[in-house]
Amino acid sequence: MKILAIRLKNLASLAGEQEIDFTREPLSSAGLFAITGPTGAGKSTVLDALCLALFGSTPRLESTSASSKVPDGRNELSSNDERNLLRRGCASGYAEVDFVGIDGHRYRARWETRRSRDKADGALQKSQQSLQDLETQQMLAANKKSEFREQLEQKLGLNFAQFTRAVLLAQSEFSAFLKASDNDRGALLEKLTDTGLYSQLSKAAYQRASQADEQRKQLEQRLEGSLPLAEQARAGLEAALESHAQARLQEQQALQRLEGQQQWFTEEQRLLQSCEHAQGQLAEARQAWDALATERETLQWLERLAPVRGLIERLKQLEQELRHSEQQQRQRTEQQAAGTERLQGLQARLQEARERQAQADNHLRQAQAPLREAFQLESEARRLERTLAERQELHRQSNQRHAQQSDAARQLDMEQQRHVAEQAQLQAALRDSQALAALGDAWVTHQGQLATFVQRRQRALESQAQLPELEKSLAHAGEPLERLQAQWTALHGSEPDDLAARLVELRRQTDSLERQQALHKEWQQVLDQRAGLARRLGELDQRMVEQEQALLDLKRQGSQCAEEVKAAEQALQVTRELLQRQRLARSASVEQLRAGLVDGEACPVCGSQEHPYHHSEQLLAALGEHDDQEQVRAEQSLERLRQTLVGLREGYSSQRERLNQSRQEQQELTGQLAALDRQLDQWTLPEELRLLQPSAQLEWLAQRLDDLAGQRQQCQRDFDRLIARQRQTQQLQQELRAAETILQQRQQALTEQRQRYEHLQQQVEEDSQQLRPLLSDEHWQRWQADPLRTFQALGESIEQRRQQQARLQQIEQRLQELKQRCDESSWQLKQSDEQRNEARQAEERAQAELAELNGRLGAHLGQHACAQDWQLSLEHAAQAAQSAVETLQAPLDSLREEQLRLAEALEHLQQQRQRQQDEFQRLQADWQAWRERQDNLDDSRLDALLGLSEEQATQWREQLQRLQEEITRQQTLEAERQAQLLQHRRQRPETDREALEDNLRQQRERLAASEQAYLETYSQLQADNQRREQSQALLAELERARAEFRRWGRLNELIGSSSGDKFRRIAQGYNLDLLVQHSNVQLRQLARRYRLQRGGSELGLLVVDTEMGDELRSVYSLSGGETFLISLALALGLASMASSKLRIESLFIDEGFGSLDPESLQLAMDALDNLQAQGRKVAVISHVQEMHERIPVQVRVQREGNGMSSLKVVG
């Protein structure tokens, strides 16, 4: 994996578009480069952009909390939202990275975000990520972030956590890792390798073992309180239950007999009320029939009027049709006269339009020859105008070329003069620095040697200056040790064994209080359950009373509904018989007799001279339909009553089932209450608790639990105080060991510093002997006074002389080019002047020709603007005349057709009116004849009968029919209920009503007592059954719990701990072995002198110094440079672990250089040189000036004011 380019826009302090291209010089050939800049300028933002483009997040954002918010306009963003990196006041931003994937292809990953409407004050939109294959230009992912993450990790070969460990090397974490304790080192290694799973497994094993142990103990306690009855006691309970069941059955049967006798009196009262109700309904029906006498007479007249009602309606319709046809005939006559007048006017206007059309056609034919000549003249004028425009353009271009060439000649002359002056200045400066000519020619060879000499002398001076500080530090190192020893003596004035014994005693007291709390809570739970059961039993008794009353109500309603069903069946039978008689009255033979009746003559059957049904076929049909509907209504009423009876029976069964369920629930609750009482009897409760009422018992237990909780808290506080003292002792021991270690380290550091100074001083003397032949006397004196500044001044002077030589060579070459270009410019200026004169003369000739042709064309066209306008005006006149003729011809033809249609319609209306008049006269004669036969029908009654609607008449007929049927039905019902009452009184019981009520009350009491005895015995048996089932189930469950506890206990012994450190130390030991192996591979390439190995403690580390006889050194004895070197090797080892088999060719180091002394810095630079020698591109982010001077290729982050920065690549 290799990074090729990083691009970004408007991220943090880096404003605008910025780019770092590792494929272009000087970065392409530089294995080591630095990202430099002042603090806060934006160096780390480059790494943020790298992570953003690849993963949409950064390590800095991942370490923040999502709960904290950052304001963004009217909204808020979480602190770990990657969009916080967008620069304030910018509408959009992006981060883009080109890289080489594990398959060798080049890819481009991009992250971008923008604000709504691309405005700086718009709301932030969701960020977007895309991945593109640069080899095939194919977009691999562009919309879904999950798809992008999957594709990127597949192509890159690393996820986010692996990338931050393998590519972004934060070696300062390993500096802390080296000198941490075992626990801290395990936690750091867990964080660095992302293997927190092992701590979680250790905690989970401990928790599961504790849970399994707790469950096992609870089951053992439950089993102790679930012992069943002996076999002899159980047999006695079963015999008692059978006896109570027989007694309860006998009492129930006796109660049913008494309830049957009570039901007779209830039924007698109901039948009396039913008879009175039927007599009242019959009287009301007869009154309603008498009140409708007027309606019955009106219906008889309607039957007599029915045969001529159609004749009357037809006469009225013919009167309206005659009036309407007369009005239509008059309108058609007027329309025909108006149409004739319009027809004559249109014919005159059409003749005039045809004459104007002939004149316009004649004018168009005469103008054809002049039009052709005018078109030819216009075509020639357009050609001359194009020629004139082309010559004007040529004239303008020649003027422009002449002006440009003149300006170019003047600029070349001025440039030539400037270069001649600069040439003279450079030649003078080179003569002044001629003394550096020889050293400058070999500067590349001697620069590294001079830099090494400067560094060694500087390190020697710094080493000499550090010696007094180290001596002083050694003198002060003993003071903390003496102070800590005095604290130890003061702290352990009492016996340590006494502290341990007190801790054990407090733990024992705490355990005892916890057991008492658990026991009291169990008592409280059982008493609370018992109070709840008693409350539920009271509510259940009340509900059972309500259910028994509801059962009696349903039984009474069912009996009443059954009687109504029986009455409805009898009424239906009576209705069917009446309807059968009415149908016989309308049978076929009766219809034949009725058809032979004659108005005014006697009926052969009854002798009446009035025959109301003779002409009332419609009335007979309506009566037949009404009979059918009446039978259907009676059947539907019977069906509804039957359904109601079924519903009442089902409700009775359901209510009885609910009562049985309540009785069963009562038995179960009674059994549970008895079981709780037995459980309380088995416990040894305090005497004062047993003497209290149930409600007071719960209050006593609550107070006792509060007291126990206070005692336990006091024990816990004492225990915590002793634990704190114990921890203080352990802390003091650690501080004593650390003070002793610091004293030893300072002694060793002073010895090593003295040896280092002597070695450096010897190297400085050797460097002086090699350097003297290279410098002149003046430079040698400066060198001895200030080597660093002299070296810098020499480098700047030699670099300046080299640049002056290169610039002088460029100027001489440029002067030759300028001389040649000046000669060419003079010749071109002369040529352009000649071309300009020729273009001006051609333009003047074209203007003269065009003016002469425009004069001829104007005389020919006259008042017309052009030939096209002249032709169009003639054609428009001809077309307008033709359109006028066509416009008049169409309405003339239409008007003629309309006149013909009006004549036909007028003739049809006259014929229709004659037919209507004939029919009206015939019907009028029939109506007069019918009126003469009706003696008692005057005009007022006739108008009233004709004004009566058919709906009203039908309503009266139906009302009369219903009243007649209701009278019949009520008569039948009253007779039936009298018969039912008589039959019921024949079955009167011997006991009177008052004595029967007393017998019922006494029987119910006996039944309740019998049921109570039965339920108590049944509850005892059920409780014993539950105990038997529970004991068997608990034994099986306890065995499973013990097996589960043994399994988790073994696992807890191996890896379990409450803090998770047990398995973490085991797992991180393996990780540490693997990390040491990978780090030693890196050390062999960076510095073969050192090698890491485990030792000193469980997770301890030692350094093997091969140049000191494989001496084992403590990590506390390493110098700053050695610590950096070991930390870098550990970071590279972790990167190798994270990347597995993937080769990482790009590394970024962001920490750890600011605290290094010059010698350590030199050692670090040597390690970095070895690192880049492995073929990797290494980027170092630091603001240390010494590193900037030693790394020539840099990416500089430059501040530009107003919080903005930019990137610049130098080298």
UniProtKB/Swiss-Prot annotation:
The keyword Hydrolase applies. GO terms for molecular function: ATP binding; ATP hydrolysis activity; DNA exonuclease activity; endonuclease activity. GO terms for cellular component: DNA repair complex. Keywords: ATP-binding, Coiled coil, DNA recombination, DNA replication, Endonuclease, Exonuclease, Hydrolase, Nuclease, Nucleotide-binding. Residues 62-81, 392-419 are annotated as: Disordered. Residues 115-156, 197-407, 497-584, 628-1048 form a coiled coil. ATP binds at G37, P38, T39, G40, A41, G42, K43, S44. Residues 71-81, 410-419 have a biased composition (Basic and acidic residues). One of its GO terms (biological process) is double-strand break repair. SbcCD cleaves DNA hairpin structures. These structures can inhibit DNA replication and are intermediates in certain DNA recombination reactions. The complex acts as a 3'->5' double strand exonuclease that can open hairpins. It also has a 5' single-strand endonuclease activity. Heterodimer of SbcC and SbcD. Belongs to the SMC family. SbcC subfamily. This is Nuclease SbcCD subunit C. It comes from Pseudomonas aeruginosa (strain ATCC 15692 / DSM 22644 / CIP 104116 / JCM 14847 / LMG 12228 / 1C / PRS 101 / PAO1). The lineage of its organism: Bacteria, Pseudomonadati, Pseudomonadota, Gammaproteobacteria, Pseudomonadales.
